[in-house]
Amino acid sequence: MTEEFNESMINDIKEGDKVTGEVQQVEDKQVVVHINGGKFNGIIPISQLSTHHIENPSEVVKVGDEVEAYVTKIEFDEENDTGAYILSKRQLETEKSYEYLQEKLDNDEVIEAEVTEVVKGGLVVDVGQRGFVPASLISTDFIEDFSVFDGQTIRIKVEELDPENNRVILSRKAVEQLENDAKKASILDSLNEGDVIDGKVARLTNFGAFIDIGGVDGLVHVSELSHEHVQTPEEVVSVGEAVKVKVKSVEKDSERISLSIKDTLPTPFENIKGKFHEDDVIEGTVVRLANFGAFVEIAPSVQGLVHISEIDHKHIGSPNEVLEPGQQVNVKILGIDEDNERISLSIKATLPKENVIESDASTTQSYLEDDNDEDKPTLGDVFGDKFKDLKF
């Protein structure tokens, strides 16, 4: 009768059952729990108290706490009619954690978790069990030192669940990407052509500079970096430098933003206001020849036009008869059109006119003194047929 009674009592609670009870004792390596409706007390070994590593059971429970756990084993001493339920609180926590995480994965939801440890390959986080954020899934940006996350609560998404292999992979990078996409959409909606905004140089390429304008990058083409000619972006800007940029265009569909630093700077013409005046004689450099004249640079990126009629006192058929690119010349400012940013120049006005007159006179005298009869005009050349009908 006694044996039948004991077996029936034991069979009331079976291995795999979920039980609840109150913590009676907290010892160094285990916790004693009074099981509701149980014949014996329950024992939770320290290794089965938590999904995290603990040194002492008192870190997670105290006397009087109500706990829930799975029965993993039943120990019974028939001779002394004593026994105990071996319990696992950790197994139940892990199961609940997987159910929670699976729901978040299915719904593509963001969760928060505390970083409990920083390891070489990434971050260990508490998600009701040990979760791992690999280094490649920590951020959209390069982060050299992961220790900045130690103890922080971070926003993450479930990337992979594998209960059989106790594998929980999470991603902080996926959340950052969502936030970046939302921020980009907001910025694209708020930007208008002509806006002048602050930014920071994010990276340089051979064709321009990418500027971070609040989480979104826009491109300043190399031709829009400066009013002066630029070979490489490094000549003008450096990574991390704060700059002002003007929005040239916004393509929302392709998420492309064209920017200009040049348009936020004074024009070369504005920089010379008050420096040059009409009738000033200054030095310049011939930069380009055209059939109607020569363009002369008188200040960095400031050019004026010397019309072909203002190149020399004597008639020339083409500017390249007397000028060439790179040549240094003196020019006189004939006029400054500030509204259209044009400057009229003259080389002729800086040349002594007397030299030209003497040259013309010398040519005439040489011609008159030439004894070559072949070059001299005859009376017939001068008067033609006017005397053909006269009789003498």
Curated annotation (Swiss-Prot):
GO terms for MF: mRNA binding; structural constituent of ribosome
GO CC annotations on file: cytosolic small ribosomal subunit
Entries under InterPro entries matching the protein: NA-bd_OB-fold, Ribos_protein_bS1-like, Ribosomal_protein_S1-like, S1_domain
Domain of life: Bacteria
Keyword Repeat: yes
Keywords from the UniProt entry: Repeat, Ribonucleoprotein, Ribosomal protein, RNA-binding
S1 motif domain segment(s): 16-90, 108-173, 194-262, 279-348
Family matches, as Gene3D superfamilies: Nucleic acid-binding proteins
Region: Disordered, residue numbers: 361-380
Family listed: Belongs to the bacterial ribosomal protein bS1 family.
Function, in words: Binds mRNA; thus facilitating recognition of the initiation point. It is needed to translate mRNA with a short Shine-Dalgarno (SD) purine-rich sequence.
Full protein name: Small ribosomal subunit protein bS1
Organism expressing this protein natively: Staphylococcus epidermidis (strain ATCC 35984 / DSM 28319 / BCRC 17069 / CCUG 31568 / BM 3577 / RP62A)
Encoding gene per record: rpsA
